[in-house]
Regions:
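Periplasmic OmpA-like peptidoglycan-binding domain that tethers envelope proteins to the cell wall
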Residues: 95-169
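Periplasmic peptidoglycan-binding/tethering modules of Gram-negative envelope proteins
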Residues: 2-91, 154, 169
Length: 169
């Protein structure tokens, strides 16, 4: 939130977004109101099989036994949405996962709920349904050794409760 902009002062403005090149400006307060600031889109090189999570250096995690998009993840989801809007021909496969702390059947069901919830969130935010496929993988693709019976921290388990956005076209 800004207070009054003083015309005699110099201000520093930084425009930053995952889909655009960061741009910085120095302007006098009196010039801000009618000044146009332009930022250029990033050119992201993608190919089928790439994961938007890795390309954007973000994380989409879920709470234990939950499938809704957590408030913290909404910021990261906005970055995925921005890329999908910039590249309207991009199609992705949403792959959702769980940790290993329940039965395999339970985790497979939960991961399918996560995948569907993630897809529905994207659709609700303007991404066409025909650009999205989704599937839950349960605990079958853990990122670490936190398998059944292995003692792990909450943080280690958290790494496995995730969604990936794999480019398919």
């Amino acid at each position: 939130k800004f207070n009054e902009i003083r015309p005699d002062r110099e201000y520093y403005i930084k425009a930053e977004n995952c889909a655009y090149l960061t741009k910085e400006y120095r302007v006098k307060g009196g010039e801000v109101e009618n000044k146009k600031f332009e930022i250029a889109p990033k050119i992201i090189q993608t190919k089928p099989g790439d994961d938007l999570v890795k390309l954007l250096n973000i994380s989409i995690y879920f709470d234990l036994d939950k499938f809704f998009i957590h408030e913290d993840a909404e910021v990261e989801m906005a970055k995925v949405i921005e890329i999908l809007k910039m590249y309207p021909n991009l199609k992705i496969d949403i792959r959702s996962h769980t940790d290993s702390r329940q039965s395999e059947a339970y985790n497979l069901r939960l991961s399918n709920f996560r995948a569907n919830s993630t897809r529905d969130y994207l659709i609700k935010n303007g991404i066409a349904k025909d650009r999205l496929t989704c599937k839950g993988y349960g605990e079958s693709k853990l990122l670490n050794d936190c398998n059944d019976g292995i003692p792990c921290t909450r943080e280690q388990h958290q790494l496995n409760r995730r969604s990936e956005f794999i480019i398919i076209e």
